């Protein structure tokens, strides 16, 4: 049973005419809709059972790289949606073959890195951001950044960030990543610093050598400012 806007929907199997007669008599109303289950149509009970099995499969799986590609999953009206960092046919096949397969699965996520040519500032009014090292290995799981505050006042920031990379054609694109962040506010006092780490997910999508940009928003005098720090990845580090 579920609501489609204001309409009550009963999911049934078998004879819908008989089911409607029984439900109309029991409820004293005709203001509902029947949805025939069977074949590729799953009831909520069936979907919940499949999700329970999926929970177990994911917990027991040793394929950490495949699990890291999953940002979440849940029961919808007719499918179980599985959200992936990289949602290519190859990644879907990998999940179905090594974690679990079901016709009820529906995948969502980025199929190709999104173009993002945005730029930010790396210093403003005594506030500046820099990578701990200018160059990291393409195999690096994380990159560390330092945000320094010498503005004479306090600044605010959070956990959210994103990373872009320059592709072989010189176009800047967003690095696929888990975009779910805990909502926390930090206050950085004058002459203090904050250390941040950005995950690069090399086990989900092998990163190429080249230029990368880290973006991080801070609030200065109640105004948001997009900070940016550039770094490189190298095969030789």
PLM ranges: what are they?
Residues 1-47, 63-98, 143:
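Short glycine/threonine-rich beta-strand-turn micro-motifs
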Residues 34-52, 107-119:
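Short proline/glycine- and acidic-rich turn/helix-capping motifs at secondary-structure junctions
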Residues 56-117, 222-236:
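A charged, solvent-exposed segment within the mature domains of Sec-exported extracytoplasmic proteins
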Residues 86, 200, 218-220:
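Short beta-strand segments enriched in hydrophobic/aromatic residues
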Residues 113-182, 187-188, 217-237:
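Primarily secretory-pathway and cell-envelope proteins
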Residues 178-205:
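Intrinsically disordered, low-complexity Pro/Gly/Ser/Thr-rich segments with frequent PxxP/GP/PP motifs
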Residues 207-218:
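A short tyrosine-centered beta-strand micro-motif
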